């Protein structure tokens, strides 16, 4: 029995590959992190087969590299993700996100009375790890929410 091992998503010469994103989360990452606000080519693989996860999403962004802060902010959505730096078609760096102390400019406060909705301020949440959850505390209204509530917002 032979297997054709072909790439399901075309390789990139230079840029970033975010792999092992939970299925159905890839589009949310593109939107929240404004990854599509570029003129560089972006390749997206959705519901790809994965030995570890069953199904996964994948994002490849040519000629673009994520900052350490951006990589760590992924931990809220895709804690098991792998972020690969690609140069000349080779992986030259590999990292996994770790939960940051603060997430800025990405999330929206679920408190409709929060001043962040009426004023031109950048969102900012303190991240607190709990036993079975992650809590996010808004810098402006100082209310604390389960990360599931903020992510659904």
UniProtKB/Swiss-Prot annotation:
Residues the record lists as binding Zn(2+): 109, 114, 138, 141
Gene name of the record: pyrI
Cellular component terms per the entry's GO annotation: aspartate carbamoyltransferase complex
Gene3D superfamilies assigned: Aspartate carbamoyltransferase regulatory subunit, C-terminal domain, Aspartate carbamoyltransferase regulatory subunit, N-terminal domain
Protein purpose: Involved in allosteric regulation of aspartate carbamoyltransferase.
InterPro entries: Asp_carbamoyltransf_reg_N (IPR020545), Asp_carbamoylTrfase_reg (IPR002801), Asp_carbamoyltrfase_reg_C (IPR020542), Asp_carbatrfase_reg_C_sf (IPR036792), Asp_carbatrfase_reg_N_sf (IPR036793)
GO biological process terms on file: 'de novo' pyrimidine nucleobase biosynthetic process; pyrimidine nucleotide biosynthetic process
Subunit structure: Contains catalytic and regulatory chains.
Cofactor entry: Zn(2+)
Entry's Gene Ontology molecular function annotations: metal ion binding
Keywords attached to this entry: Metal-binding, Pyrimidine biosynthesis, Zinc
Alphabetical list of SUPFAM superfamilies matching this protein: Aspartate carbamoyltransferase, Regulatory-chain, C-terminal domain, Aspartate carbamoyltransferase, Regulatory-chain, N-terminal domain
Family: Belongs to the PyrI family.
Details of cofactor binding: Binds 1 zinc ion per subunit.
Protein name, UniProt field: Aspartate carbamoyltransferase regulatory chain
């Amino acid at each position: 029995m032979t297997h054709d091992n072909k790439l399901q998503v075309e390789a990139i010469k230079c840029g970033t590959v975010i792999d092992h994103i939970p299925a159905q989360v890839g589009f949310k990452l593109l939107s929240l992190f404004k990854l599509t606000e570029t003129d560089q080519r972006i390749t997206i693989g959705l519901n790809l087969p994965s030995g570890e996860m069953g199904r996964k999403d994948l994002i490849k962004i040519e000629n673009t590299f994520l900052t350490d802060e951006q990589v760590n902010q992924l931990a809220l959505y895709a804690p098991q993700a792998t972020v690969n730096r690609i140069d000349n078609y080779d992986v030259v760096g590999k990292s996994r996100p770790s939960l940051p102390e603060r997430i800025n400019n990405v999330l929206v406060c679920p408190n409709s009375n929060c001043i962040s909705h009426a004023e031109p301020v950048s969102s900012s949440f303190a991240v607190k790890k709990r036993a079975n959850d992650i809590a996010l505390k808004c810098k402006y209204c100082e209310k604390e929410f389960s990360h599931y509530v903020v992510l659904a917002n």
